[in-house]
Amino acid sequence: MLLSDRDITAELDAGRVALDPYDPGMLQPASIDVRIDRFFRLFDNHKYPYIDPAEDQPELTRLIEAKQGDPFILHPGEFVLGSTFEMVTLPDDVAARLEGKSSLGRLGLLTHSTAGFIDPGFSGHVTLELSNVATLPIKLWPGMKIGQLCFFRLSSPAEKPYGSGEYASRYQGQRGPTASRSYLNFQHTDVTVTDAGQSGE
């Protein structure tokens, strides 16, 4: 069930959902606007010949901080990681989804590539996967609205929420844009085996 503005306010007032800092003026009919922080993680294309999700590639990205009062320039075709200014904390029976802002989408800015879902139990800054699909550079001003969080109540509390010992929870408590940690639990299936259990041709 998607939470309305009054439901979101009730969850915030009860301390079950938390945004830090929280500005009541960011509340929308069924979401809360979030702002972009001043930190960005750029990809260094000269350190590795390829990107491999199975490998630890610590020098694949580098962290930069936008100077006070200056925007970060996202060039056409460029992909960078950013993060929400707000730290988001969810209980075990509420999940969230990050959606982009329509006005920014109409300028060619994509707020997230795939990872818009936020598990119940998560606490941290939400990493943004920012892409410029326009033909001109886009200025990203730290503190500007970058997206909106929608909240969903689960049919029952998660038995093993994000952050519990049952899961790796690689991004719990993350601060700022956090590079991929896919190598920590990388798995792949032998796809040469058919449904009948015989090796494929």
Swiss-Prot record:
Q: What is its EC number?
A: 3.5.4.30
What reactions does this protein catalyze? Answer: dCTP + 2 H2O = dUMP + NH4(+) + diphosphate
GO molecular function annotation: dCTP deaminase (dUMP-forming) activity; dCTP deaminase activity; nucleotide binding
Q: Where is this site: Important for bifunctional activity?
A: 116-117
Which keywords, in A-to-Z order, does the entry hold? Hydrolase, Nucleotide metabolism, Nucleotide-binding
List, from the UniProt record, the residues annotated as the active site of this protein: 129 (proton donor/acceptor)
Which InterPro entries does the UniProt record give?
A: dCTP_deaminase, dUTPase-like_sf, dUTPase_trimeric
Q: In which pathway does it act?
A: Pyrimidine metabolism; dUMP biosynthesis; dUMP from dCTP: step 1/1
Q: Which GO terms describe its biological process?
A: dUMP biosynthetic process; dUTP biosynthetic process; nucleobase-containing small molecule interconversion
Transmembrane feature ranges? none
UniProt binding sites for dCTP: 101-106, 119, 127-129, 148, 162, 174
Keyword Nucleotide-binding: yes or no? Answer: yes
Q: How does it assemble?
A: Homotrimer.
Instruction: Please explain the role this protein plays, according to its UniProt record.
Output: Bifunctional enzyme that catalyzes both the deamination of dCTP to dUTP and the hydrolysis of dUTP to dUMP without releasing the toxic dUTP intermediate.
**Which HAMAP family does this UniProt record tie to the protein?**
dCTP_deaminase
The UniProt entry's sequence similarity note says: Belongs to the dCTP deaminase family.
- Protein name (database record): dCTP deaminase, dUMP-forming
- Tell me what organism the protein belongs to: Clavibacter sepedonicus (Clavibacter michiganensis subsp. sepedonicus)
Q: Name the lineage.
A: Bacteria, Bacillati, Actinomycetota, Actinomycetes, Micrococcales
